[in-house]
Amino acid sequence: MVVKVGINGFGRIGRIVFRNAIEHGEVNVVAVNDPFIETHYAAYMLKYDSTHGQFKGTIDVNSNGLTVNGKAVTFYQERDPASIPWGKHGVEYVVESTGVFTTTEKASAHLKGGAKKVIISAPSADAPMFVMGVNEKTYDPSVNVLSNASCTTNCLAPLAKVINDNFGLTEGLMTTIHSYTATQKTVDGPSSKDWRGGRTAAQNIIPSSTGAAKAVGKVIPSLNGKLTGMSMRVPTANVSVVDLTCKTEKPVTYDQIKQTIKKASEGELKGILGYSEDALVSSDLNGDSRSSIFDASAGIALNDHFIKLISWYDNEWGYSRRVVDLIAYIAKVDAGK
């Protein structure tokens, strides 16, 4: 089954969700809204990408929007989500990727335009969060607004799940070494709420806060209160890495951990959790569609209960693929299939 989807916000995630939807096959984007991007500029931004390269298909501009690989995509420039006529195009699921409408109340405005469900491509203060491979099976069709959590939570949660399910995770600290993003500065500038965040992204390692580790407790309730973490923003354009230092309930060797993660990556978490023994660096993972790629040769163990695990993720491409996967999954559940 192919699901009709709309995207609100044609920024980094909006455009990369669009590209992933074309590759996916089960999701068809038929409408896009962004009040700040007209269609000719949208075509240019979709075609050329400094990080992920030039779009391989065809893009044509017409009076209603774009034709991408022969399929029509209507464009709107509405500021109020309630004014976007999603229903006119048969849109069932809307990807809310502006970063502005991240609460249930705000995101619900899309329902007024005819959409059936809204998937927020960011953490939400009150909408239920789902991480593919971790808790998507708890999805209830009565939910109209849901969140795909964050890119970092999507990397950390599958890893934490494997450790917790097999060895018991008693407590842990996470650091994500995270590529800079659009909210950061090219030169030092004002940032009154986060002074460090106002410093030049390309010249600095910038300590920052993140709720990604605590959010794991929302998708894996048994880990609630057992994980927290922070972020280090670094001068790379894309690809990030999670460093999870944790204690296990059961005694375990690092080799046992590697074997267990490898098995999961080839089984129930295939396509979501990866496993590699290669000498990887961040650019090797650019464009990787998996949520979390465990670096077996980078982790260490202090003893049988205290370990450090390293896992890579393309914070743009991998995360956007999970947004599309989540839509395809809930569409099947909603259809009773």
Curated annotation (Swiss-Prot):
GO biological process terms held by the UniProt record: glucose metabolic process; glycolytic process
EC number(s) stated in the UniProt entry for this protein: 1.2.1.12
Pfam families referenced in this protein's UniProt entry, alphabetically: Gp_dh_C, Gp_dh_N
Organism the protein comes from: Ajellomyces capsulatus (Darling's disease fungus)
Subunit details: Homotetramer.
GO annotations of cellular component type: cytosol
Keywords: Cytoplasm, Glycolysis, NAD, Oxidoreductase
GO function term, MF aspect, one: NADP binding
UniProt pathway: Carbohydrate degradation; glycolysis; pyruvate from D-glyceraldehyde 3-phosphate: step 1/5
Family assignment from sequence similarity: Belongs to the glyceraldehyde-3-phosphate dehydrogenase family.
Protein name per UniProt: Glyceraldehyde-3-phosphate dehydrogenase
Protein's UniProt keywords contain Oxidoreductase: yes
